[in-house]
């Protein structure tokens, strides 16, 4: 505690010092700089480039918003060949990410803002019970679908709870992907293509994209974007079972032998993304704007993208890009969004209606052999079946109908306001069917007296089906009093009611009386109000001090845990529901710009109550979520960017985060300790640093040559908050820090661009999470000679070339 208190005092002092130095430096630059700004960039009267956002529902200069917000331009994403959320957020202050493979895309969020995370880093194979701590919007549709980053205007990253700005609340922050709108002015388009090769891959990666803007009249236009991206894979599956036509492992010396037949599969984690988006924009009158859009994406993945760090059953270590699982783990996902946005300008305010419907569904095959082999299931329940291949066939679905109305006043009055109403009906579905293929046939041969019994038994080991429905109704708003030309106070409130229901059907066990299905249904409503307060002071025309106190909220839910019968848990009633978790975010900061310098410095402290944790029940390991006590996250965020002379640009982002439990974590209904107070929250590095430096040269013929280097560093992270080992699955681990370096060199003419790029220049094997060998590794004693231990790693070095042609 002494250390934490010392940090807060020292951090605050340092932050104020940095802010004052930045402000003074910016003032000096404004007086001495004579560099010419590009003519196509909007500037204020004193030469400051304007970056506009719509975070508050109106178009405004990001420097005039009294909150902590970062903007990533779509052009920068294109120029640096960034197409994934993970790569983008590595360069955003306050954010940390887990390097989930493509199988987890759309199933679990990989982003944490300001340290608010207790979900184990390795989660990602199954739809979690809890919702993410960071809300995600595609334009004005709240959804987490992890779309590819193509044809994007900008990304707005807001830190801290945002429930009084948007209908969908959040705990840690909000990420908004703002797509490019159709343009009335002219017909134009572009085509992009890239080819690259990743270390340890036997093939090449490639992508092709096209964008068309088609104006039909001065107030009607259409925009189409489409493309595909193929990654050839780089993880080799070293010892996959050879299967017969029924999916049963082949026994080369007869069904009763302990021998197995395996093969290797190189570059098994290939992936393919196909996407398209169509939007139509109309302005029937000067006051009315309508935009209808449809977006879809399809993902297919050959297998998992994480290697095994450890040994096989013969004691031989796996290579750095080898996985020891006995079964391939393919997956697929389809996602769709249909949205209608309408804006009407009344003069004094703009009324916006955002109606949307999204749907996504996915499937995957998972290998559970390591889990069964290391937790006694094969010995106790399956007579040590010699070719263990427990396979999980999983599905997930998420669909919602959302309507949001927002009335936003024009700025410049004594009082400014944002008023909103929000409705969402969300349906979630998940299933898990586990098979041990070949077990009943082997058991019938091993125990001939019971052959009829085993032949009738089949190979299905476990069935789990879950249907959830969630209703969210909210009224929200902000009121700003501009009591001085340079000072203002804002207050906000979000009042809401949630209704949540969960129906689950489970049929565990191969053998009677354990294979009797039992349904469970639990409902849970909640209603409350959240508040926000903000003060901001314009220290100079382009410099602002701000401080905010805001409350965040994440809905609770219910667990399907049997209360009675063979599979009842001890203290099962304590597992039936988990409460909402809430937080109080306090921050102060200074942001501004002068000439070519931009800066944003902030310190924050977050008190997190009733923290939610995805876990398993202690006896039978049912999927569940639980509440803990309290946690605290505090830290410092720093962003600097600008130009040095006419040709150099730079950016520097730094985050310090100290996120820990402030109360011990116990198993619900018991006094079993899972984590002591003071435990570091998982996937949250203390230090995050990123930066970039670029140089532009202009040739006599007008061509531009741009060279850029970017780097990121994160310090060590923990794998799970459960460090004591009372959990069914022990995954406690700590992973060292690592650095990533990227290079690019581009030559561009009037309507074309060619880029040579290198990602992960030093081929750093950075690990951000794992399924540990202690729980998933090899176990020759039960004839499991592979390993399901896996590490979530950064993508190996990738070298490629991309081209773009505009027409």
Residue ranges: model-predicted function:
Residues 200-302, 398-399, 403, 408-424, ...:
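Transmembrane beta-barrel wall of Gram-negative outer-membrane proteins
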Residues 712-722, 746-807:
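C-terminal beta-signal and adjacent terminal beta-strands/loops
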Residues 281-287, 407-410, 420-424, 466-606, ...:
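Structural signature of Gram-negative outer-membrane beta-barrels, strongest in the C-terminal barrel
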Residues 339-368, 538, 544-550, 577-636, ...:
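Membrane-embedded beta-barrel scaffold of Gram-negative outer-membrane proteins
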Residues 1-92, 213, 286, 290, ...:
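N-terminal Sec signal peptide and the immediately downstream disordered periplasmic leader
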Residues 46-184, 588:
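Acidic, small-polar-rich N-terminal luminal/periplasmic segments of exported/outer-membrane proteins
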Residues 258-417, 424-426, 598-600:
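Outer-membrane beta-barrel domain signature, strongest for Gram-negative TonB-dependent receptors
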Residues 417, 485-489, 605-607, 626-721, ...:
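Gram-negative outer-membrane beta-barrel transporters
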């Amino acid at each position: 505690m002494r250390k934490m208190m010392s940090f807060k005092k020292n951090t605050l002092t340092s932050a104020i010092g940095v802010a004052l130095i930045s402000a003074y430096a910016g003032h000096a630059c404004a007086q001495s700089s004579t560099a010419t700004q590009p003519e196509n960039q909007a500037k204020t009267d004193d030469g400051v480039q304007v970056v506009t956002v719509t975070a508050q529902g109106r178009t405004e200069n990001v420097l005039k918003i009294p909150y902590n917000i970062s903007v990533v331009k779509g052009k920068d994403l294109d120029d640096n060949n960034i197409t994934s959320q993970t790569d983008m957020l590595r360069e955003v202050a306050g954010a940390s990410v887990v390097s989930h493979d493509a199988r987890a895309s759309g199933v679990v969020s990989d982003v944490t803002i300001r340290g608010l995370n207790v979900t184990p880093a390795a989660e990602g194979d199954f739809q979690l019970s809890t919702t993410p701590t960071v809300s995600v919007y595609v334009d004005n549709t709240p959804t987490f679908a992890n779309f590819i980053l193509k044809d994007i205007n900008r990304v707005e990253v807001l830190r801290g709870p945002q429930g009084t700005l948007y209908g969908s609340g959040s705990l840690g922050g909000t990420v908004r992907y703002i797509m490019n709108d159709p343009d009335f002015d002219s017909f134009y388009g572009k085509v992009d293509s890239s080819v690259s090769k990743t270390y340890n891959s036997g093939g090449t990666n490639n992508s092709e994209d096209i964008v068309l803007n088609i104006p039909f009249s001065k107030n009607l236009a259409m925009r189409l974007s489409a493309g595909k991206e193929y990654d050839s894979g780089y993880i080799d599956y070293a010892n996959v079972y050879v299967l017969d036509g029924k999916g049963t492992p082949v026994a080369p010396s007869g069904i009763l032998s302990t021998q197995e037949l395996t093969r290797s599969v190189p570059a098994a984690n290939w992936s393919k993304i196909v996407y398209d988006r169509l939007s139509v924009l109309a302005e029937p009158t000067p006051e009315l704007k309508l935009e209808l859009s449809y977006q879809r994406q399809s993902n297919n993945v050959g297998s998992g993208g994480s290697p095994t760090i450890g040994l096989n059953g013969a004691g031989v270590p796996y290579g750095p890009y080898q996985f020891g699982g006995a079964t391939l783990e393919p997956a697929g996902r389809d996602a769709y969004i249909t949205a209608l946005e309408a804006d009407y300008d009344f003069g004094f305010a703009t009324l916006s209606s955002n109606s949307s419907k999204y749907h996504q569904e996915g499937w995957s095959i998972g290998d559970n052999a390591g889990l069964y082999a290391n937790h006694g299931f094969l010995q106790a329940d399956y007579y040590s079946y010699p070719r263990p291949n427990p396979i999980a066939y999983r599905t997930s679905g998420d669909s919602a109908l959302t309507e949001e109305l927002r009335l936003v006043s024009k700025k410049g009055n004594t009082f400014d306001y944002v008023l909103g109403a929000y409705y969402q009906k969300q349906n979630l579905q998940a299933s898990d069917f586990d098979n041990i293929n070949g077990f009943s046939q082997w058991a019938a041969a091993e125990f001939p007296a019971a052959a009829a019994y085993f032949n009738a038994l089949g190979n299905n080991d476990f069935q789990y089906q879950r249907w959830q429905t969630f209703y969210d109704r909210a009224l929200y708003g902000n009121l700003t009093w501009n009591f001085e030309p340079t000072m203002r106070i804002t207050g906000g409130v979000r009042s809401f009611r949630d209704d949540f229901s969960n129906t689950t059907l489970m049929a565990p066990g191969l053998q009677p009386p354990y294979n009797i299905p039992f349904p469970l249904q639990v409902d849970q409503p909640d209603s409350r109000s959240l508040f926000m307060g903000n003060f901001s002071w314009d220290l100079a025309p382009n410099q602002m001090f701000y401080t905010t106190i805001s409350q965040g909220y994440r809905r609770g839910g219910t667990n399907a845990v049997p209360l009675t019968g063979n599979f009842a848990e001890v203290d099962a009633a304590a597992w039936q529901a988990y409460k909402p978790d809430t937080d109080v975010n306090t921050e102060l900061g200074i942001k501004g710009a002068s000439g070519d310098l931009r800066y944003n410095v902030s310190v924050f402290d977050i008190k997190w109550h009733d923290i939610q944790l995805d876990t398993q029940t202690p006896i039978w390991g049912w999927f569940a979520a639980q509440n803990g006590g309290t946690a605290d996250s505090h830290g410092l965020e720093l962003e600097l960017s600008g130009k040095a002379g006419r040709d150099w640009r730079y950016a520097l982002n730094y985050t310090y985060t100290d996120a820990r439990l402030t109360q011990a974590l116990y198993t619900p209904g018991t006094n079993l300790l899972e984590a002591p107070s003071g435990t570091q929250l998982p996937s949250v590095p203390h230090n995050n640093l990123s930066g970039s430096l670029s140089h532009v040269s202009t040739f006599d013929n007008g061509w531009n040559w741009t060279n850029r280097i970017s780097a990121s560093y994160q310090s060590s992270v923990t794998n799970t908050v459960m460090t004591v080992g009372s959990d069914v699955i022990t995954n406690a681990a700590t992973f060292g820090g690592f650095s990533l370096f990227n290079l690019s060199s581009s030559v561009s003419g009037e309507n074309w661009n060619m880029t040579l790029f290198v990602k992960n220049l030093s081929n750093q094997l950075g690990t951000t999470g794992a399924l540990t060998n202690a729980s998933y590794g090899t176990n020759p004693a039960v004839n499991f000679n592979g390993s399901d231990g896996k590490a979530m790693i950064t993508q190996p070095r990738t070298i490629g070339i991309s081209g773009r042609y505009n027409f």
